[in-house]
From Swiss-Prot:
Belongs to the universal ribosomal protein uS10 family. PANTHER family: 30S RIBOSOMAL PROTEIN S10 FAMILY MEMBER (PTHR11700). Its main location: mitochondrion. The gene is RSM10. Component of the mitochondrial ribosome (mitoribosome), a dedicated translation machinery responsible for the synthesis of mitochondrial genome-encoded proteins, including at least some of the essential transmembrane subunits of the mitochondrial respiratory chain. The mitoribosomes are attached to the mitochondrial inner membrane and translation products are cotranslationally integrated into the membrane. This is Small ribosomal subunit protein uS10m.
């Protein structure tokens, strides 16, 4: 007669290490300590006394600026006023830590510029598997697998003027990461009679940047901008 034996092994600790009465007492004690901690926070005002972190000689008792001190915490966000989406910033890359740094930098920049923002939202991660031959001759039958993971995150800006959004995006583009791809979508809101305002415009004033240019390409661009077909599609 064949007998099969089964053996099991688990590294999980015991669920109940305390008796029921000891567990109830522990929960009550934790509730009392939490209430005491909340009362102490509401009554006692904590003193702001940051440390001086610098290798140079500084003025005595000179504190660190508050915006530098806030780098240790999550980015602050302003509340929405109307909830109108004005811009969407999508970032993607292969290193998730860099995406978090870029997202927090954009959130901190928007906070100091007065732009209400959404939290940093994670989008669907893209995973791809590539299979190629190892070499075209002797090892042509040998295959190699390459696994690529692309992370994506998104930020949404609300209730801000177009000029502020352009300034915010230009500052982010100026300090961008080389291994992170940025994609911004800007939304603009116009009145209901916007098409009538466009029809009422008879002439479009070109910028002065095209004046006095001898470049034939620039002259051709100026000619196309003045053409009737361009104004018709505009």
């Amino acid at each position: 007669m064949l007998r099969i034996g089964y053996r099991g092994f688990s590294t999980r600790s015991r669920v109940f290490k305390l008796s029921p009465q000891e567990y109830v007492n522990q929960v009550q004690q934790e509730k009392i300590e939490n209430e005491q901690f909340k009362q102490a926070l509401s009554q006692d005002q904590l003193e702001y006394n940051p440390k001086i972190l610098s290798s140079h000689k500084l003025t005595k008792n000179r504190p660190i600026p508050i915006n530098v001190e806030l780098l240790k915490y999550k980015p602050l966000r302003l509340p929405k006023t109307h909830g109108d989406e004005v811009a969407t910033l999508t970032i993607r890359g292969y290193d998730e830590d860099n995406l978090i740094r870029v997202g927090e930098f954009a959130l901190r920049t928007a906070y100091y510029m007065g732009i209400p923002m959404s939290p940093l939202m994670a989008l669907k991660t893209e995973k791809r598997l590539y299979t190629v031959i190892k070499s075209p001759f002797a090892q042509a039958k040998t295959k190699q697998n390459f696994h690529r993971v692309t992370y994506k995150k998104k930020l949404v800006a609300y209730d801000a003027n177009p000029e502020i959004i352009d300034l915010w995006l230009s500052y982010i583009n100026k300090n961008k990461f080389t291994d992170v791809e940025y994609k911004a979508t800007v939304s603009s809101y116009e009145s209901l009679n916007y098409h009538e305002e466009l029809k009422s415009l008879k002439e479009f004033n070109l910028p002065d940047a095209y004046e006095g240019i001898e470049d034939p390409v620039a002259k051709k661009v100026q000619e196309l901008l003045k053409s009737k077909s361009f104004k018709k599609h505009l």
